[in-house]
Regions:
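Acidic donor-binding loop at a coil-to-helix junction in glycosyltransferase catalytic cores
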Residues: 161-168
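Acidic helix N-cap motif at the loop->helix transition within catalytic regions
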Residues: 18, 42-50, 88, 92
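Catalytic beta-strand/loop signature of glycosyltransferases that borders the donor
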Residues: 110, 158, 179-186
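Short aromatic/hydrophobic "clamp" motif used to bind/position activated sugar donors
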Residues: 80
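Conserved donor NDP-sugar-binding/catalytic core segment of glycosyltransferases
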Residues: 92-121
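A conserved acidic beta->alpha catalytic loop
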Residues: 23, 37-46, 84
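Short, acidic, metal-binding catalytic loop of nucleotide-sugar glycosyltransferases
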Residues: 22-31
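Glycine-rich, basic loop-to-helix element that forms the pyrophosphate-binding segment
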Residues: 59-75
């Protein structure tokens, strides 16, 4: 079975970090787990060190894309999952995604919100580049080949207001990588006032213009 690396970037969300890390540790298949402390000023360091993970990286604050890239650079897995520190995944998330590994390069699942919302989202089964231009077709926590990150240049570290995952999927599908989504709610997205999505929505037009200008 191909090795999977789960990257957990964290910045000042120590209160939620245990949920994310435990959901990674509890996967039904073995995974490499890497926590990236993106210059947190709270007790993230203390909390992170309570867990036995494969790698713990501490870096200067550079934003979510920078933290993801730092973790992926150190990852040894053929497949990568970025799991934000305020979210979590079902125990069989990786196992179910890997069933599609021979046919697809990016594999996502349905999304169940929790916290300030209980909305659920399912996505188009096989979205294309054209679909991604219209709207983001998968969530930020989707399994992908490390080869994609190496080919398209990683996450854009200039994007600090959000949509960095949408931008990443846009560039990946433009490069010809194929996407599949599983119609099951295996990703749990914590909705709260500090969510990056809330910030991104406020800057939607300028972010869209920036993303499309790079294509």
């Amino acid at each position: 079975m191909q090795k999977v690396s789960i990257i957990i970037p964290c910045y000042n969300q120590s209160q939620w970090l245990p949920d994310a890390v435990n959901s990674a540790l509890n996967q039904t298949v073995p995974c490499e787990i890497i926590i990236v402390n993106d210059g947190s000023t709270d007790n993230t360091d203390e909390v992170a060190k309570q867990f036995y993970v494969d790698k713990y990286i501490v870096k200067e604050n550079g934003g979510l894309s920078s933290a993801r890239n730092a973790g992926i650079k150190e990852a040894t897995g053929e497949w990568i999952l970025t799991l934000d520190s305020d979210d979590k995944i079902a125990p069989d998330f990786i196992e179910k995604c890997l069933k599609y590994k021979d046919e697809y390069d990016i594999i996502g699942t349905g999304q169940q919100e929790f916290g300030d919302s209980d909305n659920k989202h399912l996505f188009k089964t096989n979205p294309t580049f054209t679909d991604f231009i219209q709207n983001n077709q998968i969530n930020c926590c989707s399994l992908f080949r490390k080869e994609i990150w190496e080919t398209i240049g990683g996450y854009d570290e200039e994007m600090k207001l959000g949509y960095e995952d949408w931008d990443y999927w846009l560039r990946a599908t433009k490069a010809g990588y194929k996407v599949a989504t599983i119609p099951e709610y295996l990703f749990f997205y914590r909705k709260h006032g500090e969510s990056m999505v809330s910030t991104a929505i406020k800057h939607h037009n300028e972010l869209m213009q920036y993303m499309l200008s790079k294509l």
